[in-house]
């Protein structure tokens, strides 16, 4: 089951901090589904370095970012 996190109403750097905290709490096989009002480009670089993959969907102001470990 995916873990849901909505950071769309938060101001920087809180969205990044909450997303990183939630990633650390993921259980094996679990993915993180994030609702965000913008594309967090600094996060994408961090995810690659951490060994995670991501997929984005949506449009300006309403994005959904799905995050999971590379090996899954």
Residue ranges and their predicted role:
Residues 1-26:
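An N-terminal amphipathic alpha-helical segment
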Residues 2-3, 49-50, 71:
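Intrinsically disordered, low-complexity terminal tails/loops enriched in metal-binding residues
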Residues 25, 45, 56-58:
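Sterically constrained small-residue positions within well-ordered secondary structures
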Residues 33-53:
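Short, structured protein-protein interaction patches enriched in aromatics and acidic/basic residues
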Residues 55-72:
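C-terminal edge-of-domain segments
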